């Protein structure tokens, strides 16, 4: 394994602990921040006849999440009303969804999206898979804590009652947030062993030893698995993604594919999800909003770069073509610029 590859691996999203999370975010803390002034301006905007949506969008999309929490606190102190409730009364449609998402902490937002994906008849497997496959240990542990706080039940219990079979086992294992962290020592012997076991458990035999796949893909560190998937190609005639498509079907196939794509290149994974949400006729606004809100302070700059590289046009351009009005304005602010 080349030194360059090892350095790049150490800089992967999960393992780069030296870089502040906001370094690749499009939304930065506002420099001359004044929570009281912002709260007053939002109060005035809500009271304006017809609602001054532009002011609300300008403020909330140009403040960090921590700053938005301060604004919400200042607003409640001023008006004796909760800001999310005021937003629900003042706004509607997709713009309301974006603004309410921005007012939640990242863990509250993910917890509420997970709950919504399992509420009522039918399960939104896509949302469930995206969130659980893409969050780090730390994020998942915080989501579990906040989920219990918000809904008085465990996330794991809800996943168990809403899913079944091997798909359920994979999600439950991932949701624990117990994956090994990236270490400084690279265990080439274990990399080779895991690659061989993934091959032996799938393509090499008749039927698939899914529990073996689950244990390796949910317990090993991201950096380790990146190397395992590379090594896997020396055993199998197919790469890991092709092997998954041959071996399993349905929700389980979808979950494994999402998981491997996240491990290989998380910003590219989100770039693909964003492209899929806007391609063709109609827009999958729920996916578009969730990614723009949840990644704006994490890795939006990397996502933009991968998007432009793969699709030839900027994410900003796609959003401009696919959305309109103040909803469009909000998403473009979260995007943080054209490429």
UniProtKB/Swiss-Prot annotation:
Disulfide bonds: none
Mod. after translation: ISGylated.
One record GO biological process: cell-matrix adhesion
Crosslinked residue numbers (Glycyl lysine isopeptide (Lys-Gly) (interchain with G-Cter in SUMO1)): 49
Alphabetized UniProt keyword annotations: Acetylation, Annexin, Basement membrane, Calcium, Calcium/phospholipid-binding, Extracellular matrix, Isopeptide bond, Phosphoprotein, Repeat, Secreted, Ubl conjugation
Record region (S100A10-binding site): 2-24
Residues the record lists as N6-acetyllysine modifications: 49, 152, 227
InterPro entries referenced in this protein's UniProt entry, alphabetically: Annexin, Annexin_repeat, Annexin_repeat_CS, Annexin_sf, ANX2
Positions of modified residues (Phosphotyrosine): 24, 199
GO CC, one annotated term: cytoplasm
Start and stop residues of the Annexin repeats: 33-104, 105-176, 189-261, 265-336
Database matches in PROSITE patterns: ANNEXIN_1, ANNEXIN_2
N-acetylserine modification, residue list: 2
Location(s) in or outside the cell: Secreted, Extracellular space, Extracellular matrix, Basement membrane; Melanosome
Domain of life: Eukaryota
GO molecular function terms attached to this record: actin filament binding; bone sialoprotein binding; calcium ion binding; calcium-dependent phospholipid binding; calcium-dependent protein binding; identical protein binding; phosphatidylinositol-4,5-bisphosphate binding; phosphatidylserine binding
Covalent cross-link (Glycyl lysine isopeptide (Lys-Gly) (interchain with G-Cter in SUMO2)), residues: 49
Modified residue annotations for Phosphoserine: 26, 184
Record PANTHER family: ANNEXIN, ANNEXIN A2-RELATED
Summary of subunit composition and partner proteins: Heterotetramer containing 2 light chains of S100A10/p11 and 2 heavy chains of ANXA2/p36. Interacts with ATP1B1. Interacts with DYSF. Interacts with COCH. Interacts (via repeat Annexin 1) with PCSK9 (via the C-terminal domain); the interaction inhibits the degradation of LDLR. Interacts with CEACAM1 (via the cytoplasmic domain); this interaction is regulated by phosphorylation of CEACAM1. Interacts with APPL2 and APPL1; targets APPL2 to endosomes and acting in parallel to RAB5A. Interacts with S100A4. May interact with UBAP2.
Entry domain remark: A pair of annexin repeats may form one binding site for calcium and phospholipid.
Other remarks in the entry: It may cross-link plasma membrane phospholipids with actin and the cytoskeleton and be involved with exocytosis.
Function: Calcium-regulated membrane-binding protein whose affinity for calcium is greatly enhanced by anionic phospholipids. It binds two calcium ions with high affinity. May be involved in heat-stress response. Inhibits PCSK9-enhanced LDLR degradation, probably reduces PCSK9 protein levels via a translational mechanism but also competes with LDLR for binding with PCSK9. Binds to endosomes damaged by phagocytosis of particulate wear debris and participates in endosomal membrane stabilization, thereby limiting NLRP3 inflammasome activation.
Protein name: Annexin A2
Native source organism of the sequence: Rattus norvegicus (Rat)
């Amino acid at each position: 394994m080349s030194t360059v590859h090892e350095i790049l691996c150490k800089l992967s999203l999960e393992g780069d602990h030296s870089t502040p999370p906001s370094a690749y975010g499009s939304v930065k803390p506002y420099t001359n921040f004044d929570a009281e002034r912002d709260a007053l301006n939002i109060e005035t905007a809500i009271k304006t006849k017809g609602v001054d949506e532009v002011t609300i969008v300008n403020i909330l999309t140009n403040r960090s999440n921590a700053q938005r929490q301060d604004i919400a606190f200042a607003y409640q102190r001023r008006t004796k009303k909760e800001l999310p409730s005021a937003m629900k009364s003042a706004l509607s449609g997709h713009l309301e969804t974006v603004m309410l998402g921005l007012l939640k902490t990242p863990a509250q937002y993910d917890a509420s999206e997970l709950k919504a994906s399992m509420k009522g008849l039918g399960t939104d497997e896509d949302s469930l898979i995206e969130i659980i496959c893409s969050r780090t240990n730390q994020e998942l542990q915080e989501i579990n804590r906040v989920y219990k706080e918000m809904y008085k039940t465990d996330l794991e219990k809800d996943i168990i009652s809403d899913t079944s079979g091997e798909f359920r086992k994979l999600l439950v294992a991932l949701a624990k947030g117990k994956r090994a962290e990236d270490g400084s020592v690279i265990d080439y012997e274990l990399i080779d062993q895991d690659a061989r076991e993934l091959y032996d458990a799938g393509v090499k035999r008749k039927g698939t030893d899914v529990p073996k796949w689950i244990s390796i893909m949910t317990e090993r560190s991201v950096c380790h698995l990146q190397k395992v998937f590379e090594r896997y190609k020396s055993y199998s005639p197919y790469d890991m993604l092709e092997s998954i498509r041959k071996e399993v079907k349905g929700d389980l196939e979808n979950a494994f594919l999402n998981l491997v794509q996240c491990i290989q290149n998380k910003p590219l994974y989100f770039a693909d999800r964003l492209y899929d949400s806007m391609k063709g006729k109609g827009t999958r606004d729920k996916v578009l909003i969730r990614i723009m809100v949840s990644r704006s302070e994490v890795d939006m700059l990397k996502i933009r770069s991968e998007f432009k590289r793969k699709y030839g046009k900027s994410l900003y351009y796609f959003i401009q073509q696919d959305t309109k009005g103040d909803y469009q304005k909000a998403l473009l602010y979260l995007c943080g610029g054209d490429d």
